[in-house]
């Protein structure tokens, strides 16, 4: 499945979600992504289809408009924030334009595998006149730093897909103006399409690292990286350093193509990220 996300909770279980398609097509011949499934297992290996030692549940489903427009439910992520479970995902918001997609959220305040999930609707901004989420927007992720929540996401303010950051007042509302962190500038970020998307955060060695996806979603899809000192202001774009080369690309020898939109999780013994 595309856009895999794995979260290790304090209960010792791994929770997995990803973009899911049942391989059915709409009338335009496009794959339909209309469900959000979550899996839970005691190990990362147990999450795989081949092992199958997991429990799985559909927590959200949306039928195509008029039967022919895919709702484009993409890139779900499952997070546990301040005592509640959240699933962040992207979906279509228009009855006429399948490409009008925006960030959304679900919430569960009980057992994510058995209790009800509530649709909280689109992610909001409290900043009057902000451009946030007014254009093609997707791949939002959330991280906590020094007691504050921050959201990263990709948005097409121009023809390119860029990555932005903002501070949050709660898990579904940003409360500062969006700050541009990176836009596609190198050749390896512009194969097929000029794209920076799919940000993912990991903290290590006194730094915060953001790994992100670049180029179109074909064999040349790859990963770039930026980092910042953990004591710097994450909303200060000038404090971030962007590598001029990709950190993960296709390997013809190993027949691995299009590595993109990753996530990070903890090892079973909690020694490694």
Where are the regions that the model predicts?
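Carbohydrate-active catalytic/glycan-binding domains of CAZyme proteins
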Residues: 1-273
């Amino acid at each position: 499945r595309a856009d895999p996300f794995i979260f290790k909770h304090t209960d010792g279980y791994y929770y997995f979600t990803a973009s899911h398609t049942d391989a059915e097509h709409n009338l335009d011949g496009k794959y339909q992504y209309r469900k959000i499934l979550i899996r839970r297992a005691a190990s990362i290996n147990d999450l795989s289809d081949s092992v199958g030692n997991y429990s799985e549940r559909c927590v959200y489903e949306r039928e195509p408009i008029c039967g022919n427009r895919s709702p484009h439910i993409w890139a779900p992520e499952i997070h546990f924030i301040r005592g509640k479970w959240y699933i962040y995902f992207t979906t279509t918001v228009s009855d006429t334009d399948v490409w009008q997609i925006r960030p959304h959220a679900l919430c569960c305040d009980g057992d994510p595998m058995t209790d009800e999930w509530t649709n909280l609707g689109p992610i909001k901004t409290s900043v009057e006149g902000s451009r946030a989420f007014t254009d093609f927007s997707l791949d939002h992720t959330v991280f906590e730093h020094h007691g504050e929540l921050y959201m990263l996401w990709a948005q097409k303010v121009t023809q390119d897909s860029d990555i932005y950051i903002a501070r949050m007042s709660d898990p579904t509302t940003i409360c500062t103006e969006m700050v541009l962190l990176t836009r596609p500038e190198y050749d390896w970020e512009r194969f097929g399409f000029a794209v920076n998307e799919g940000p993912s955060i990991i903290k290590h060695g006194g730094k915060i690292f953001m790994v992100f996806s670049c180029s179109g979603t074909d064999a040349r899809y790859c990963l770039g990286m930026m980092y910042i000192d953990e004591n710097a202001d994450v909303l200060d774009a000038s404090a971030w350093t962007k590598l001029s080369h990709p950190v993960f690309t296709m390997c013809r020898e190993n027949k691995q193509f299009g590595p993109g939109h990753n996530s990070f999780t903890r090892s079973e013994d909690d020694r490694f990220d």
